[in-house]
From Swiss-Prot:
Residues 1-11 have a biased composition (Polar residues). Adaptor protein complex 3 (AP-3) is a heterotetramer composed of two large adaptins (delta-type subunit AP3D1 and beta-type subunit AP3B1 or AP3B2), a medium adaptin (mu-type subunit AP3M1 or AP3M2) and a small adaptin (sigma-type subunit APS1 or AP3S2). AP-3 associates with the BLOC-1 complex. Interacts with KIF3A; interaction is direct; interaction is impaired by pyrophosphorylation of AP3B1. Residues 1-26, 663-800 are annotated as: Disordered. GO terms for cellular component: AP-3 adaptor complex; axon cytoplasm; clathrin adaptor complex; clathrin-coated vesicle membrane; Golgi apparatus. Its main location: membrane. The lineage of its organism: Eukaryota, Metazoa, Chordata, Craniata, Vertebrata. SUPFAM superfamilies: ARM repeat. This is AP-3 complex subunit beta-1. Residues 718-729, 754-767 have a biased composition (Low complexity). It comes from the Eukaryota. Residues 678-717, 768-781 have a biased composition (Acidic residues). Keywords: Cytoplasmic vesicle, Golgi apparatus, Membrane, Phosphoprotein, Protein transport, Transport.
């Protein structure tokens, strides 16, 4: 029978028959199990044969069936070898489906996927955008560290692709590469910065998601793209909108002042009885001055408002949380209607939305009161939905609607869902505590529930009544008597314990009932729950103190039972009570106060909403749902007291247009800008902005814009006129920007203050934009801001020629050192210009120069052991000398030894495996090395200011050996000579985020000046800075690659402690150096 089925399946159309056969087999008796397995196996064999067929139609049919299997959740991983063979198919449809399959299984079958990696690389150049994007997706799905450089190169190329779909996939690949190798963060940030400038709505959401994953703290990357993201938001795909809105919410909380400020308008009742005319005038001015919202803040709120109508619940929830966290309270009410609309969705969506509404309704009841009936419970609701609706109804309850809600709650108590009924009773108790007018009504209703047939309802009622009676201890003695009668019929431990606690607390008010209750419970003590036993012991102790004649023997009997109980908590409580209430020779002073201890007035319980403390989590996040901080959660920062400079969000439109001017003319145009009229500038800016909306415009200007990022506020003609010289001064520019950021901002503020018309215009823009809602006014506002920015730039550029001459004179007069550190070029940094304007030619100039090493350690490192190198041994050390092969390279000396009795020929460096950006200058090949001979050669390696390993092959005539050189962080520095004054000045500029410090504890003899000097220079190649204080030692250096200053301070404290402080722009290197210096200084 089985042979017939095999033969039948081999015929054409056997695939469909097999699928039908499978479905039929599943309904047959277990005896047909073999048929099921054989048909499964045969079906896969059939698919493999179709994939190996010469006909494209068969392959296409097989791939469609395989993708269909994946879509149904079936495992198709065993077909990977057969599928991957078709990755180079010329049929575009087959290739698409193959890539869909590979994206799913490449991570599981990494070894097989690596065999086709060359095909994927070729596919990255395919004319079809879908193939290019799919190849990138497959490549990024192969999670093997060895292909990280290939992935990085592919992402770089794809980020500049003409197709926005490919660029979108490049943004997705960034996240995968970062999770595979976090050390690539800096290079990935550069790509993210480039993609953030992309004007395609297809790319925006994906690149913001990559930004959130890789560098969410780099808010500076968002400044220039903020307005573009706000304007593109409506057209971005739905899930991209969610990510962008959440990111912009965090951004707004750091860049704008709070719109919730109280006291901006004076109240009438604050006015004094007698006021002078001036005081009345001042108060009237304050009363007229409302909160002026930043135009960019208003832009975000206005552009997200239409998204409240989105069909996607996640988008609506994202906009709702944005309004809740950053919009004025008077405007946040519009989100309530949209959130109520979402309650018609699935129960999962309802659950999340109701949780967020529950949090909102605690603080702002008025938002959801008009929609009270929307939160009434339906019989079809799930239990979790019912309980959340109860929570919201409780939050919205007030004197006006409580009567309606109580009638609703009476119906809920009768529900067959016992968990929901118990929650309703808890709700009634909360309403009774929050609204005193109905507390008696609620209490009477709960007492009526004590006669309910359902034991769970009675038990929950007892617990709630106990809490309510605790708030009014002097009343309701009859209720306590009634509850004592119910003790025989109630079996729920929590309810029995509550009744016993109530009787114990009020034992003096019910002197006849309490001893009888103790007698009954003493009989059943051994069979009671542990919670009830504890309350029986407490009741016995209280009665022993208040009515010992009647209850003394009974209490001793209960204490003896508790002494031998199985639960150690009961035994422990018994010993505690016996020592406290039964005085004996060993009793301490506490026994005198036993009555005060047991019968003290207990504070009333506080019935609060479980959502009260959730508002510190951002709404709509997983952390808010779980009420605990989830992995990857980004906290919302507090509003700043003073808004940061809004000019950082201004886009330099004129600068973008100038990139297309010839290189030789760019320098001449800069001083002539003052001859252009304002109207012409305004026209130019509007034209260039409209041109930049096209797709080609966004692509063509990106590379140049990246090279010049950060230079737009400086001399714009520098990079255009001297491209070659600009490359040579790259380190100088980055150094100037790093140290002058804060001064640049201050300088821009001063320039804006010098022009009254400019400041007046910007203030009028703020007022009009905060009052206006129309799109046309927002456009004119943005143009006005651009014009204002251009006026500020003109003011600076008019001053540039004079300052340039002065600074050139100064530098010519004082350029006395042959090897200066890369200092900021005068024409680039406004902060340096401001410093040089008041400089006197007779003043002493501060010059920071590279000095000779203070100490060169003789420590060598093994490069190649003689056993591994077949007799060839190699050691390397760092001579701390300037490298002759390049200014950015670290000099490395390698000593080669021949430990064999034969000559070793043709020693050279073979293949190199260097991280991205790293460069190596190898030594010349050595023709031969005699037996027992030794030779020392020099190499230069540019480590790019990192401690990454430089891997290469050391080869001889017959063999190649893989070797590694990993530099200590102290060898990536060059010593610097500078004065104490210059040191303090540079240290002041490198404070805050650029400063790391730690405390060192060591013996006093280890803090001698000579010891500290020897330990520091042994670890790091730094120069000694003269210090006028005996307890402070200063050292200075610069990084070899970028020339960034590294300032080290050791400040001795009282006792045997000291503080180690490192200031540098290179915070990673600074923290590594700190970790290496700390143990060295601590040890004896």
């Amino acid at each position: 029978m089985s042979s017939n089925s095999f033969a039948y399946n081999e015929q054409s159309g056997g695939g469909e028959a097999t699928e039908l056969g499978q479905e039929a087999t599943s309904t047959i008796s277990p005896s047909g199990a073999f048929g099921l397995f054989s048909s499964d196996m045969k079906k896969n064999e059939d698919l493999k044969q179709m994939l190996e067929s010469n006909k494209d139609s068969a392959k296409l049919d097989a791939m469609k069936r395989i993708v269909g299997m994946i879509a149904k959740g079936k495992n198709a991983s065993e077909l990977f070898p057969a599928v991957v063979k078709n990755v180079a198919s010329k049929n575009i449809e087959i290739k698409k489906l193959v890539y869909v399959y590979l994206v799913r299984y490449a991570e599981e079958q990494q070894d097989l996927a690596l065999l086709s990696i060359s095909t994927f690389q070729r596919a990255l150049k395919d004319p079809n955008q879908l193939i290019r994007a799919s190849a990138l997706r497959v490549l990024s799905s192969i999670r093997v560290p060895i292909i990280v450089p290939i992935m990085m190169l592919a992402i770089k190329e794809a980020s500049a692709d003409l197709s926005p779909y490919v660029r979108k996939n490049a943004a997705h690949a960034i996240q995968k590469l970062y999770s595979l190798d976090p050390e690539q963060k800096e290079m990935l940030i550069e790509i993210i910065e480039k993609l953030l400038k992309d004007k395609s709505t297809l790319v925006a959401g994906s690149v913001v998601m990559a930004f959130e994953e890789v560098c969410p703290d780099r808010i500076d990357l968002i400044h220039k793209n903020y307005r573009k993201l706000c304007n593109l938001l409506v057209d971005v795909e739905e899930w991209g909108q969610v990510v962008i809105i959440h990111m912009l919410t965090r951004y707004a909380r750091t860049q704008f002042v709070s719109p919730w400020r109280q006291g901006d308008v004076l109240e009438d009742n604050e006015k004094d009885f007698y006021d002078s005319d001036e005081e009345q005038k001042e108060k009237a001015d304050k009363r007229k001055r409302p909160y002026a919202m930043d135009p960019d803040h208003r832009l975000l709120i206005r552009n997200t408002k239409p998204l409240l109508q989105s069909r996607n619940a996640a988008v609506v929830m994202a906009v709702a949380q944005l309004y809740w966290h950053i919009a004025p309270k008077s405007e946040a009410g519009i989100i309530s209607k949209s959130l109520v609309r979402l309650l018609r969705s699935s129960r999962e969506v309802q659950y999340i939305v109701l949780q967020n509404i529950a949090t909102m309704s605690i603080q702002r009841k008025g938002m959801f009161e008009p929609y009270l009936k929307s939160f009434y419970v339906r019989s079809t609701d799930a239990t979790m939905i019912k309980i959340l609706k109860l929570e919201i109804l409780t939050n919205l309850a007030n004197e006006a609607n409580i009567s309606t809600l109580l009638r609703e709650f009476q119906t809920y108590v009768k529900s067959q869902d016992k968990q929901f009924a118990a929650a309703t009773i808890q709700t009634i108790g909360r309403c009774a505590t929050s609204i005193t007018e109905v507390s008696d009504t609620c209490l009477n209703g709960l007492v009526c529930l004590l006669s309910n047939r359902d034991e769970i309802v009675v038990a929950e009622s007892v617990v709630v009544i106990k809490k309510l009676l605790q708030m009014q201890p002097m009343q309701h003695g009859e209720i306590i008597k009634h509850m004592a009668k119910l003790l025989d019929s109630i079996t729920v431990p929590v309810a029995r314990a509550s009744i016993l606690w109530l009787i114990g607390e009020n034992c003096e008010r019910v002197p006849k009932i309490a001893p009888d209750v103790l007698r009954k419970t003493a009989k059943s003590f051994t069979s009671e729950d542990d919670l009830v036993k504890l309350q029986i012991l407490n009741l016995g102790a209280k009665l022993y103190l208040t009515n010992s004649k009647q209850t003394k023997l009974l209490t001793q009997y209960i204490l003896n039972l508790g002494k031998y109980d199985q639960n150690y908590d009961i035994r422990d409580r018994t010993r505690f009570i016996r020592q406290l209430i039964v005085p004996n020779e060993k009793s301490g002073a506490l026994s005198k106060y036993a009555k005060k201890i047991f019968l003290a007035q207990k504070p009333a319980p506080l019935l609060e909403s479980p959502f009260k403390d959730r508002d510190h989590f951002q709404l709509g996040t997983l952390s808010h749902t779980l009420n605990t901080k989830a992995t990857g959660y980004l906290e919302l920062s507090n509003w700043p007291e003073v808004a940061p400079d809004p000019s950082v969000r201004n886009v330099e439109v004129i600068e973008l247009a100038k990139e297309w001017t010839p290189a030789g003319k760019a320098k001449k145009e800069n001083p002539d800008k003052k001859f252009y009229s304002e109207s012409e500038e305004e026209e130019d800016s509007s034209e260039s902005s409209s041109d930049s909306e096209s797709e080609s415009g966004s692509e063509s200007g990106e590379d140049e814009e990246d090279d010049r990022s950060g230079d737009s506020a400086e001399d714009s003609g520098e990079s255009g006129s001297e491209p070659e010289a600009g490359k040579g001064r790259a380190a100088t520019r980055s150094r100037a920007r790093g140290r002058g950021d804060s001064k640049d901002v201050d300088k821009e503020k001063e320039n804006s203050k010098t022009s009254e018309s400019s400041s007046g215009e910007s203030s009028s823009i703020e007022e009009s934009s905060s009052d206006s809602e129309s799109e046309s006014e927002s456009e004119s506002e943005s143009e006005s801001r651009k014009v204002t920015k251009e006026k500020e730039k003109k003011t600076k550029q008019e001053r540039n020629p004079l300052t340039k001459d002065v600074s050139l004179l100064d530098l010519d007069d004082f350029n006395l050192v042959s090897t200066p550190v890369a200092l900021p070029t005068p024409a680039l940094s406004p902060s340096l210009i401001a410093d040089l304007e008041g400089l006197n030619l007779s003043a002493t100039s501060s010059v920071i120069s590279v000095s000779t090493p203070v100490f060169v350690p003789g420590k060598t490192h093994v490069l190649l052991h003689r056993m591994s190198g077949k007799g060839l041994a190699a050691h390397y050390f760092f001579p701390r000398q300037p490298c002759i092969f390049g200014d950015k390279m670290v000099s490395v000396q390698i000593t080669l030894n021949n430990t064999t009795d034969q000559k070793i020929e043709n020693i050279h460096v073979g293949g190199k495996k260097l991280p991205m950006g790293m460069q190596m200058h190898v030594f010349n090949p050595i023709e031969s090395l005699e037996p027992a001979g030794s030779i020392t050669v020099s190499m230069g390696i540019d480590f790019c200011d990192s401690t990454q390993t430089a891997s290469f092959q050391l080869c001889t005539k017959d063999d190649c050996f893989s070797v590694n050189i990993q530099p200590p962080v102290g060898e990536l520095l060059l010593p610097v000579a500078m004065s104490e004054k210059d040191f303090k000045k540079e240290q002041g500029m490198l404070s805050g985020m650029n400063e790391t410090s730690t405390t060192i504890i060591a013996a006093p003899q280890n803090f001698a000046s000579s010891v500290i000097l020897q330990k520091i220079v042994n670890v790091a190649n730094v120069g000694v800075v003269p210090s006028g204080q005996d307890n402070i030692h200063r050292f200075a250096a610069k990084t070899v690659h970028s020339g960034s200053l590294m300032l080290v301070t050791v400040e001795l404290k009282e006792g045997s402690t000291a503080q180690l402080i490192i200031n540098t722009e290179k915070t990673v290197i600074g923290s590594v150096l700190l970790r290496e210096l700390k143990p060295v200084l601590s040890q004896g």
